[in-house]
Amino acid sequence: MLVDIIFQYRSLLGKCELGVGLEWDEIERVTELESSFAPTKDDRRMSASGRRYRREATKLSAVMRGDRINDRVDVIEMGPGGLVCRNAPYVSRGEQVEIVIEDENLSYRFRAVGVWLKDDGEDFRVGLALVGMPVCLHKVAISAHEADVVDQLAAAA
């Protein structure tokens, strides 16, 4: 899935930024991911905007969280450098937000900074640049509760 690929890339990039360094296989993976998102000859607008990576069209539901923001948004484009959200609240240029994308038993958390904003009817279309290292939370089901002494004492009371 696209979200997992972006998560892998941002994690490896974050590892570099922390000064930990990468193993040879991780360096190869970063190179592979960067080449897969390299602009094509048809992506003329990228050179004008200064974007380094191509964004892929997608249809994901996410939650945007920030200062007085906790809204459901639609992620319509995503790439290693950033993403575009539709049905978004107002996000000023430079404002930091968190994008939470749920995928079955995983919850991806990306930090992003507002870059541009366009009026989209009642809501906005927002361009965000990804920053920092993302987090992936694994959801696990706890086993069924087994009655014990505490439960027996509570029932007797």
Region annotations inferred by a language model:
Residues 46, 95-99, 111-113:
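Short structured motifs
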Residues 102-107:
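Short, charged beta-turn/beta-strand-edge "cap" motif at the junction between a beta-strand
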Residues 73-74, 109-116:
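Short beta-strand-centered aromatic/proline hotspots
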